[in-house]
């Protein structure tokens, strides 16, 4: 499953298919003349897609995919007697990815960002986001789109350029505030 790429990877998907892999492409970039032969393509900008929000970032595409998967699992009874995953807990990450990807803030993206900032300001953010804000000397209770786009985004991008991008990912997804701060 790709995230935020793959719509132009005709040869890469063909190679993965030849190796016996099943490929799903999730992307928001504009497709070329030829689409990859993936088992599934989720992209609001592909021909024939009726999803109304065409300006999603890759993180937004993946967020809506997880919402759809949860709805399908609910319909199939997968949560009978069990609690459903709280996908709202991901909105701080969705907001960060949306702003850092510099996509157009249409009504849908504005809602995603506003809800994510609301969670951050309420102290309901992932430990990695809180750690990055703290290290940058920013007050989470006053978090803004500036913080997401010009304070956190560049720090995460720098991790990939200087060292290994997985450090930034691990920081964001860490459940341990101390470990997140050390990353």
Regions found by a protein language model. Give the residues of each.
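N-terminal small/polar loop signature for handling phosphorylated ligands or for N-terminal nucleophile
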Residues: 1-36, 41-44
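Hydrophobic helix-and-loop "lid/oligomerization" segment in the mid-to-C-terminal part
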Residues: 2, 19, 71-183
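Short acidic, glycine/serine/threonine-rich loops at helix termini
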Residues: 11-15, 34-39, 53-55, 74, ...
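Alpha-helical scaffold elements adjacent to nucleotide-binding pockets in ATP/GTP-utilizing enzyme cores
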Residues: 12-15, 61-68, 112-115
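Short alpha-helices
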Residues: 36-79, 87-94
């Amino acid at each position: 499953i790709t995230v935020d790429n793959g719509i132009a990877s005709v040869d890469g998907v063909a190679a993965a298919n030849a190796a016996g892999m099943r490929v799903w492409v999730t992307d928001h970039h504009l497709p070329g003349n030829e689409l990859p032969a993936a088992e599934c393509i989720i992209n609001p900008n592909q021909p024939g897609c009726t999803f109304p929000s065409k300006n999603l970032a890759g993180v937004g595409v993946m967020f809506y995919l997880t919402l759809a998967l949860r709805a399908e699992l609910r319909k199939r009874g997968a949560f009978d007697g069990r609690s459903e995953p709280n996908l709202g807990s991901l909105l701080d990450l969705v907001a960060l990815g949306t702003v850092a990807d510099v996509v157009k803030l249409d009504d849908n993206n504005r809602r995603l960002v506003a809800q994510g900032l609301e969670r951050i300001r309420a102290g309901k953010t992932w430990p990695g986001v809180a750690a990055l804000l703290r290290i940058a000397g920013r007050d989470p209770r006053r978090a803004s789109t500036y913080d997401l786009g010009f304070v956190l985004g560049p720090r995460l991008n720098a991790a990939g350029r200087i060292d290994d991008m997985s450090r930034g990912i691990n920081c964001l997804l860490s459940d341990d505030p101390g470990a997140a701060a050390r990353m």
